[in-house]
Amino acid sequence: MKKIKILLGIAMVVSVLTIPVHGAEGDTAIPVISETPQITPVETPVRELRVEGNKIFYYYKGKMVRNKWKRYEGYKYYFGEDGYACIGGSKIGNKAYVFDENGHLLENQKGKMRTVLNKKYCIASDNGQPKTGYFIYHNDLYYADSKGRCYQNRTREDGQLYFTSSGKARKDTNALLKMRVMNLVSRLTTPEMSKNQKLHACWEYIVDDAGFQYGGSDPDLKKAGWCRKTALSMLNTKVGNCYGFASTLAAFAKELGYKKIELIDGRTPGTRDHAPDGFTGHCWVRIDNRYYDPEADWAGWMTGVYGYSFYPIRHYVKKVYNFMR
């Protein structure tokens, strides 16, 4: 009897397991549970240099950097008000710096001529600052603007100086005289001197130190630029007459920044011309309406005519020439 009960129990269990389950509205699907994949967040770099077209930006902790110097992977950059890295000659504060096409400051390149985006720059310091104004490089004259960009295919000083596509000035009388006088002024003066002190140092060079000798013929006063040609000849040969002395002082004055420089062709008492009126041809200088006579001082027949408000001896004027033209 016990054995029969056990068998009946097993049969009931089997029947229960084999009976399909029906819901009120049909079969109910067993839900499938799937795991959602975990997304690892991408970390924002602390420092990031981005290049978009020809623009370079720098981000620090996700924020664009502006008006700051930054060094990245060994290179130094400056990012301006718009966030762009500076390229070429750039003014930062009151100083100019030069950056290459990739925005890298041109460090440790003192004394080198570099080209960035077809512009020439002469690097003056190891921290990437360029030369500005007039300068001489490998015996050639250049001029650079306030950002260090050399003039190319342009003129200066009312066309007297022409700068070629290479940035070098055409080597004519004007450029050669400019370089000669620049070198002498640099040697004879110091930055601490006033303009008048510098002019006096140049005067002393002419009348005492240069070793000039009197000689040569008078220049052709009808030719344009005769005074600059005469000054260059005087400095190169150390020989000249009153026109040479006057023209040389005028060239120094121009280099020092004087603007009103005139050569006076006149006659003063003397016998050199053997003229019956007792006068002879002579040339002296007027700078900012002050009179200077370097040849008279050098020769000793009239000394100390430096910065006079009038010309101190009897004379008459034939013609006044503007040295700046």
Which residue stretches match the model-derived regions?
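Extracellular adhesion/carbohydrate-binding repeat motifs centered on closely spaced tryptophans
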Residues: 3-180, 218-219, 265-288, 297, ...
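Short, basic/low-complexity N-terminal boundary segments at the transition from targeting/disordered tails
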Residues: 121, 258-261, 323
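His-Asp-centered catalytic microenvironments across diverse enzyme cores
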Residues: 153, 251, 287-325
